[in-house]
């Protein structure tokens, strides 16, 4: 066995024992904390119980990791020469252009909607009104507008706008 192979195999064993060690430590301290709160057993009994629980948790975590490596081997194998990326540098060069502003600016446009399209319903008498069947719904009006906006933008600008929206909602 070559020195490089031995070093790689030791690193693989160390990496494979990281999760079981964390699980065992967490189980040990959780058991000790539970015994301290309960105060119904002697200290050496609590430590022995915590040690057995930690060994069981570590063996279980190691077995689950080995089973996962057997079932989905690509999940835990690192590609040769590639290190995991610690962070992603996200740079947005997209500046909001004036073309995305509303076409009318501050100009108010008159609408042709009137209350003549409302007809009285028979159930509520004079107080109840409903829209006539020929009036398009709010969803119909807005879906056309949103669809046009999304298809008019290039792919990169849509992605930049989506990323900005997500980042602004997180803060």
UniProtKB/Swiss-Prot annotation:
Subcellular localization, as worded in the UniProt entry: Cell membrane
GO cellular-component term (any): plasma membrane
Origin superkingdom: Bacteria
Primary subcellular site in the record, as a coarse category: membrane
Classification of source organism: Bacteria, Pseudomonadati, Spirochaetota, Spirochaetia, Spirochaetales
Stated name of the protein: Uncharacterized protein TP_0708
Keywords, ordered alphabetically: Cell membrane, Membrane, Transmembrane, Transmembrane helix
Bilayer disposition of the protein: Multi-pass membrane protein
Segments passing through the bilayer: 13-35, 50-72
Organism: Treponema pallidum (strain Nichols)
């Amino acid at each position: 066995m070559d020195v490089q192979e031995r070093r790689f195999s030791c690193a693989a064993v160390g990496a494979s024992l990281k999760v079981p060690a964390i699980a065992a430590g967490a189980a040990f301290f959780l058991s000790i904390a539970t015994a301290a709160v309960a105060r119904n057993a002697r200290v050496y009994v609590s430590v022995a119980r915590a040690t057995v629980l930690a060994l069981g948790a570590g063996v279980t975590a190691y077995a689950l990791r080995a089973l996962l490596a057997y079932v989905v081997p690509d999940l835990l194998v690192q590609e040769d020469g590639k290190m995991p990326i610690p962070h992603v540098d996200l740079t947005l060069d997209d500046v909001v252009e004036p073309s995305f502003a509303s076409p009318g600016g501050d100009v108010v446009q008159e609408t042709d909607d009137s209350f003549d399209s409302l007809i009285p319903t028979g159930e509520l008498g004079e107080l109840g009104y409903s829209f006539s069947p020929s009036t398009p719904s709010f969803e119909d009006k807005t879906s056309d507008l949103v669809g046009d906006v999304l298809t008019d933008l290039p792919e990169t600008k849509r992605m930049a706008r989506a990323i900005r929206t997500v980042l602004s909602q997180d803060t």
